[in-house]
Design a protein with these regions (language model features):
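Alpha-helix C-terminal capping segments
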Residues: 11-17, 100-102, 150, 167, ...
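Internal alpha-helical scaffold of NAD(P)-dependent oxidoreductase catalytic cores
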Residues: 19, 34-123, 166
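Short capping/connector residues at structural and topological boundaries
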Residues: 31-34, 76, 136, 140
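NAD(P)-dependent Rossmann-like dehydrogenase/reductase catalytic/cofactor-binding core
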Residues: 109-171
């Protein structure tokens, strides 16, 4: 069997192999930093049921049975897109936050407890319930002040507006 590990590629990209599969670990991997959390989902798919069983067994040995998901290509692509929002975009927000703090000679460490608590909240409740902040409260005065502070950064200002409006629409 030949399997790929992509969250976005269709299983058909390896259809020239009669026994094809997908073994997609849903985790953020970095060349610089080794993986800290060994608990993560593995999504599997195969063209044959015996190969699917083999992929499930391998995944279960690595992460446990409860973290193995049988997903078709459409479902896997949806998971990957959601993961980009949840992981890649949130990390980019951390980068922006760090830049904003550095302007005032502040260290990113001041935000780490907030980041951890936010992540812990979404373990206990759904993200909509966990949402806080001026956009959620409809605090126009604070949002206007933030917009003034972001005047030197049109991209950050546009991003702030876009995300705030998205939060307001989903209140």
């Amino acid at each position: 069997m030949v399997a790929h590990t992509s969250g976005t590629l269709d299983i058909d990209v390896i259809s020239n192999f009669p026994e094809a599969g997908v073994f997609y670990p849903l985790q953020s991997f970095s060349r610089i930093n080794p993986l800290q959390n060994k608990e993560f989902p593995i999504c599997v798919e195969a063209t044959r049921s015996d190969n699917l069983h083999s992929l499930k067994e391998l995944a279960a040995k690595l992460v446990g049975v409860g973290s193995v998901y049988e997903l078709n290509t459409i479902q896997r692509k949806a998971v990957h897109l959601a993961a980009v929002f949840a992981s890649n975009y949130s990390n980019h927000m951390y980068q922006i936050a760090e830049e904003l703090l550095k302007r005032e000679d502040l260290n990113f460490d001041i935000l780490r407890p907030l980041i951890v608590e936010t992540a812990e909240k979404v373990k206990r409740m759904n993200p909509k319930e966990a949402q806080t902040g001026p956009a959620k409260r409809g605090d126009v005065k604070v949002m206007q002040e933030h917009m003034r502070e972001l005047e030197p950064d049109p991209d950050y200002k546009a991003l702030y507006t876009l995300i705030s409006n998205s939060i307001i629409k989903r209140k």
